[in-house]
């Protein structure tokens, strides 16, 4: 019996779904449609030229194999996209291998969040390119996007995608040398190597990676020796065809004091920007998060949270956790009326000034503004000063040197160190994370009050 084009494609999808990892199937295969079937060839339509190109390089062989299994004979495969680009594939000689083989003996990466996988990442219009690019890198490192530079604000999913690459690659190839490090860790390793006279060991460690994932690269600004060492590490890996993925809160050209040669290297691949998620994506994120927490949320609650928490995913998920915790403790039903008081959605924000932050920090930690601007190393003053620098960088557009000036003329490297330290601590210390959230709320409330007076 002769198959219709749609019947053939349905069978192709069923077989591919059982053979491919779910993220790969959903991103590359599931979005494609069959356009034409003749006795000589099959035309497949991809959603856009980006997906078309990846299908051509990585999936035509397996599609051709499945089509031949179903039909009992081979036919040519042609690709087209909804935007009019076409690639003709005649036979199997032009089809790329499905997965390249990597070998290695290095230990697996450490400190990966088990939740940061592709299957738990919610794709929306704000992050579709970044998601597709990271998945492409995970499947075929060193081929299409090298380096891959992810940029976007705090809490938008850059770290999630970077660690998803590591999880995916290690699941497929457990012996792969995949290194995930923060810029702070790279710098600390370099400092330790210098102190212990073991620079060669440091270089051999990083320069034998198959995939190097470096988070928060913006903190390399002002660190001249770290930039020098990273430049040579980057070159060694890139020339060997190894994959480098970098994440930052801003594009390369906007990182202060970053050397031109690094800006050039970081810009030579793909720069994928991650934007703030739209309402539909925020609702999907909340729904998925609730499912993982085994909670059923009414649609009106999801819509309420998604409507009022718009800045980033971290803020959004934090609101959901507060809601679930409150309902669990109080025993109340999950309604907007019951949750509205505890959620306290953020309001319109006014201008946040350095003076505002200094005064709030001084009041909270019972120190004076002069203490914050001074050089005292007393633990309580030093911590308050570091938190103040962290919050000033988070909530203002001031440069590092300008923030240093607001704290009594501190060097920009001191500001960088303080930001790095608090940023790392808050990821491990729940109390500190909550304190920072509360301080941020106070800053925004005060700025709004200041705006209306």
UniProtKB/Swiss-Prot annotation:
UniProt region (Domain I, interacts with DnaA modulators), positions on chain: 1-73
InterPro entries with a match to the protein in the record: AAA+_ATPase, Chromosome_initiator_DnaA, Chromosome_initiator_DnaA-like, Chromosome_initiator_DnaA_CS, DnaA_C, DnaA_dom, DnaA_N_dom, DnaA_N_sf
Major subcellular site: cytoplasm
UniProt region (Domain IV, binds dsDNA), positions on chain: 328-453
NADP found in the keyword field: no
Record keywords: ATP-binding, Cytoplasm, DNA replication, DNA-binding, Lipid-binding, Nucleotide-binding
Entries under Gene3D superfamilies matching the protein: 1.10.1750.10, 1.10.8.60, 3.30.300.180, P-loop containing nucleotide triphosphate hydrolases (3.40.50.300)
Location of the protein in the cell: Cytoplasm
Segments traversing the membrane: none
Record's subunit section: Oligomerizes as a right-handed, spiral filament on DNA at oriC.
Protein name per the record: Chromosomal replication initiator protein DnaA
Gene name of the record: dnaA
């Amino acid at each position: 019996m002769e198959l219709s084009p749609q019947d053939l494609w349905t069978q192709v999808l069923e077989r591919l779904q059982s053979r491919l990892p779910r993220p790969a199937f959903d991103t590359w295969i599931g979005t494609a449609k069959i356009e034409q079937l003749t006795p000589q060839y099959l035309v497949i339509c991809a959603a856009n030229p980006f997906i078309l190109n990846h299908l051509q390089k990585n999936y035509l062989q397996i599609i051709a194999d499945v089509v031949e299994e179903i039909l009992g004979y081979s036919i040519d495969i042609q690709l087209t996209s909804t935007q009019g680009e076409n690639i003709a594939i005649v036979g199997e000689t032009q089809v790329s291998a499905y997965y390249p083989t990597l070998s290695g003996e290095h230990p697996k990466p450490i400190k990966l969040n088990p939740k940061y996988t592709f299957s738990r990442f919610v794709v929306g219009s704000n992050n579709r390119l970044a998601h597709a690019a990271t998945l492409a890198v995970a499947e075929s490192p060193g081929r299409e996007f090298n380096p891959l530079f992810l940029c976007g604000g705090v809490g938008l999913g850059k770290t999630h995608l970077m660690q998803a690459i590591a999880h995916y690659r290690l699941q497929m190839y457990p012996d792969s040398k995949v290194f995930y490090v923060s810029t702070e860790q790279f710098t600390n390793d370099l400092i330790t190597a210098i102190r212990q006279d073991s620079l060669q060991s440091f270089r051999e460690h990083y320069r034998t990676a198959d995939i190097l994932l470096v988070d928060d690269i913006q903190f390399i600004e002002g660190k001249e020796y770290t930039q020098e060492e990273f430049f040579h590490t980057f070159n060694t890996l890139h020339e060997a065809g190894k994959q480098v993925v970098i994440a930052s809160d801003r594009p390369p050209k906007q990182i202060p004091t970053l050397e031109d040669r690094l800006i050039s290297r970081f810009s030579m691949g793909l720069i994928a920007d991650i934007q703030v998620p739209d309402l539909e994506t925020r609702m999907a994120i909340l729904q998925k998060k609730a499912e993982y927490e085994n909670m059923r949320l009414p649609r009106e609650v999801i819509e309420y949270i998604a409507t009022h928490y718009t800045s980033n995913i971290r803020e959004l998920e934090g609101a959901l956790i507060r809601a679930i915790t409150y309902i669990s403790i109080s025993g109340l039903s999950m309604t907007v009326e019951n949750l509205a008081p505890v959620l306290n959605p953020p309001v319109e924000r006014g201008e946040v000034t350095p003076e505002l932050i200094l005064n709030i920090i001084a009041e909270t930690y019972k120190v004076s503004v002069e203490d914050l601007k001074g050089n005292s190393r007393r633990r309580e003053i030093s911590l308050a000063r570091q938190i103040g620098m962290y919050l000033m960088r988070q909530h203002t557009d001031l440069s590092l040197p300008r923030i240093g000036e607001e704290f009594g003329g501190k060097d920009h490297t001191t500001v960088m160190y303080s930001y790095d330290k608090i940023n790392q601590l808050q990821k491990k210390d729940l109390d500190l994370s909550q304190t920072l959230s509360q301080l941020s709320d106070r800053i925004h409330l005060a700025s709004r009050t200041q705006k209306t007076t």
